[in-house]
Amino acid sequence: RSPRVFWRGEVANHAAHAGKRKGYPCKSERGNHARLAALALMADDPSHFDVKCNVGCEARDATKWPCPGLAYDATMRKIYADNSSIRDPKFYTEPDYANYKYVLNLPGKTDGSYSRNLNHLWYVGAAVLLWDTPAVEWYYPALKHGATHAAINRTTARAVVEALDASPDKYSRLLAGARRVQKELT
């Protein structure tokens, strides 16, 4: 398995809806912001992260459409200006995900289910990393950081992955936890 964290998906720009809603729909932006932050992990540390857009990759213009609490850091601004390094047009299936040691779940779009992507991650044989987000799925109460998954964000991701790499027991616990979630909850 590749020792990196894997994710593929979309960052969608909601600017087309701004005129209809009298301003940028910042309430719909949390998932995109998390996705752009995860893409910044790849830009900063490709040896640990294989996180790319394979569909749309059009982030919000944070200067034109600022959203409270959703500012971009320097790497995120760089990606906004030129996203060529974090694009991958290939479509990946579950066997492709199984080639990675870690799989990442990021918040989804408000017009789709967050759990739709997460449901297939539990059974690919990799440790599941969940982006730390206020979004809650129906089975989240049954999940426990360190037992079923590891929670990460922009600032903790690398340290969490390095700690799991340094502890085969913790990593094995996450694999067993993912199998349990797949068997009992999905």
Regions found by a protein language model. Give the residues of each.
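Phosphate-/polyanion-interacting regions in eukaryotic proteins
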Residues: 1-86
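Catalytic binding pocket for nucleotide-activated donors in carbohydrate/polymer assembly enzymes
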Residues: 91-186
